[in-house]
């Protein structure tokens, strides 16, 4: 199960990136096997996949680079988690990740916090967004197709500028040693 919705025209240039993001997860799966998923390793791993997807979409991406941060007390040195650029547009991204239970997908506060952090990245005139990766889990057994569809429906209720999700069939039974099943990943983007 895979899809994307872009609600903000300024982020339309990310459509091929979000499509190739799932392809990058599939490539990882081909090499690492069904017992390992890149998206449960945290924000840095997911940022790397999104950067790889940008390059595959013939855009440019740069992770973890030094730059100016804007705060009330003025400008200071900081870092940006990711930038994605086309010939016409550049997006500066602050990234975070959450691992909620499948039935508890209210990520509104986490998305607002991530977008607030993104406001400090780059200059006020530059396009900025918070990117929240969501790796939902379920205890004891894998998620049914109906539960995954409910999850996607819940994701679409968020006031995000762009939403992408990928719940690959190969990972439907992926779980850790605690019996937590991680069926896939979603990405919420909110312009700062």
What is each stretch, according to the model?
Residues 1-49, 53:
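Interdomain/boundary linker segments immediately adjacent to catalytic/signaling cores
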Residues 49-55, 97-101:
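Catalytic lumenal/periplasmic loop and adjoining terminal transmembrane helix
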Residues 54-75, 80-85:
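A short acidic/basic microdomain associated with nuclease active sites
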Residues 55, 118-122, 156:
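N-terminal cationic-hydrophobic initiation segments that often serve targeting/anchoring roles
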Residues 78, 89, 180-183:
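Residues at beta-strand starts and edge strands
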Residues 80-103:
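Conserved catalytic cores of phosphodiester-cleaving nucleases, focusing on short active-site segments
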Residues 95-150:
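Catalytic cores of nucleic-acid endonucleases
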Residues 127-192:
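Glycine-rich, aromatic-bearing surface loops/beta-hairpins
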């Amino acid at each position: 199960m895979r899809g994307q919705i872009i609600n903000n025209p300024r982020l339309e240039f990310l459509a091929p990136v979000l499509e190739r993001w799932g392809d990058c997860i599939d490539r990882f799966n081909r090499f690492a096997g069904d017992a390992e998923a890149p998206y449960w390793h945290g924000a840095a791993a997911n940022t790397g996949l999104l950067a790889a997807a940008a390059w595959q979409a013939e855009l440019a991406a740069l992770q973890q680079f030094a730059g100016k941060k804007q705060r009330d007390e003025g400008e200071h040195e900081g870092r940006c988690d990711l930038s994605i650029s086309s010939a016409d547009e550049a997006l500066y991204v602050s990234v975070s990740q959450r691992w909620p239970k499948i039935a508890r997908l209210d990520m509104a506060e986490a998305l607002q916090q991530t977008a607030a952090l993104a406001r400090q990245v780059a200059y006020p005139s530059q396009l900025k967004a918070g990117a929240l990766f969501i790796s939902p889990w379920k205890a004891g057994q894998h998620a049914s197709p109906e539960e995954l569809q409910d999850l996607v429906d819940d994701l679409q209720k968020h006031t995000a500028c762009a939403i992408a999700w990928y719940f690959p069939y190969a990972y439907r039974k992926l779980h850790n040693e605690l019996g937590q099943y991680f069926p896939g990943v979603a990405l919420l983007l909110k312009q700062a």
